[in-house]
């Protein structure tokens, strides 16, 4: 894939984002505030998923393994 096609594709994605989120009709300072809020929410969701999903997967694994009768020698 050449650089121009990638650049055009990313520009198209950004345009789609602006149209879907109605950012195209906002003033520049409103766009920056909106994008900052969206980026902050996205970062918080990613961080929360990174921190808490492995814990929940481990707890679910322990629950179902005990329920099915499999006892691991690794867990205490």
From Swiss-Prot:
Residues 30-36 are lumenal. GO terms for cellular component: endoplasmic reticulum membrane; serine palmitoyltransferase complex. Pathway: Lipid metabolism; sphingolipid metabolism. It is a multi-pass membrane protein. It is found in: Endoplasmic reticulum membrane. GO terms for biological process: ceramide biosynthetic process; endoplasmic reticulum organization; sphingolipid biosynthetic process; sphingosine biosynthetic process. One of its GO terms (molecular function) is serine C-palmitoyltransferase activity. Its main location: endoplasmic reticulum. The chain crosses the membrane at residues 12-29, 37-57. Residues 1-11, 58-76 are cytoplasmic. Component of the serine palmitoyltransferase (SPT) complex, which is composed of SPTLC1, SPTLC2 or SPTLC3 and SPTSSA or SPTSSB. The heterodimer consisting of SPTLC1 and SPTLC2/SPTLC3 forms the catalytic core of the enzyme, while SPTSSA or SPTSSB subunits determine substrate specificity. SPT also interacts with ORMDL proteins, especially ORMDL3, which negatively regulate SPT activity in the presence of ceramides. Belongs to the SPTSS family. SPTSSB subfamily. Component of the serine palmitoyltransferase multisubunit enzyme (SPT) that catalyzes the initial and rate-limiting step in sphingolipid biosynthesis by condensing L-serine and activated acyl-CoA (most commonly palmitoyl-CoA) to form long-chain bases. The SPT complex is composed of SPTLC1, SPTLC2 or SPTLC3 and SPTSSA or SPTSSB. Within this complex, the heterodimer consisting of SPTLC1 and SPTLC2/SPTLC3 forms the catalytic core. Within the SPT complex, SPTSSB stimulates the catalytic activity and plays a role in substrate specificity. This is Serine palmitoyltransferase small subunit B. It comes from Bos taurus (Bovine). The lineage of its organism: Eukaryota, Metazoa, Chordata, Craniata, Vertebrata.
């Amino acid at each position: 894939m050449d650089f121009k096609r990638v650049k055009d594709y990313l520009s198209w994605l950004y345009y789609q984002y602006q149209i879907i989120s109605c950012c195209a009709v906002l003033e520049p300072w409103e766009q920056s505030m909106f994008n900052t809020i969206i980026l902050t929410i996205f970062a918080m969701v990613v961080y929360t998923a990174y921190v808490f999903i492995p814990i929940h997967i481990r707890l679910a694994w322990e629950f179902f393994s005990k329920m099915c009768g499999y006892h691991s020698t690794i867990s205490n």
